[in-house]
Amino acid sequence: MDQPIFILGALREEINLIRKLMNVKEQLKAGHADVWVGSWERVSIVLVRTGMGKDCALSGLKGVLSRTVPALVLSIGYAGGLDLRLKVGDLVVADKVLEIDQAATFSKSYLVNPQQPDLFERLTSQKKIMIYKGTLLTVNQVISDSSAKQELGSSHKALAVDMETSSIIGHCIEKKIPFVSVRAISDTMEQSLINTSSFVDGEGKVSKIKAGWYAATHPSAIKNLISLRSQSQKATANLTEILGVFLRTF
């Protein structure tokens, strides 16, 4: 296959295992985005760490599209659960993406039409990892409160929420590029998250100094931080495993 697959993730933690498994031939910057060019599972890959949010994701995608046109764009990463069935480490394959504005009202809707019609069936053959197919919400802020997640899931009949996918699929549809979104649940609907805005910047980079200060001044949050790290590691491992399965059959 001459055309590569683009794999876009917002955070270093989301893509780190993929980067370690890749045969990296080139590393570069595309604007603010970090890019690794190489192969994984004998498939040509362009791995992109875009940074958090719709604007960063779109900018990163446009940056790598200026170099080459892919066979497929994969939007990957973490998502918050909006359905009681979803547990940490479960995966969501989006068949529809909704973009919700700051007031949590309906904004845009995109249908996902994967080039691989049996994608979901092939992925669900991995019985040890639960995979769901359904609606993914994109908002431009972290949804940290469990009641807010419950309301979003109920109002929009969605399985999960992220911060990047709608801008990626919107541009892919415009450019007629095949698109797939696979997200791993890092926090469940019942779980409220701590506010990380004081130590995580707009590109999703964690300041160790600021995070340390937050932990020192909020000792009760240390347990939650450790738990979230463990959950994120499980989400990353499951996501990477399933993406490897997908590439081996692509």
For the regions a protein language model found, what residue spans apply to each?
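Glycine-rich phosphate- or other oxyanion-binding loops that anchor nucleotides, phosphorylated ligands
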Residues: 2-5, 29-250
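N-terminal glycine-/serine-/threonine-rich phosphate-binding loop
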Residues: 12, 21-34
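Short, conserved "active-site rim" segments that organize catalytic pockets and cofactor/ligand binding
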Residues: 2-22
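Generic N-terminal helix/loop capping motif
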Residues: 18-21, 25, 64-67
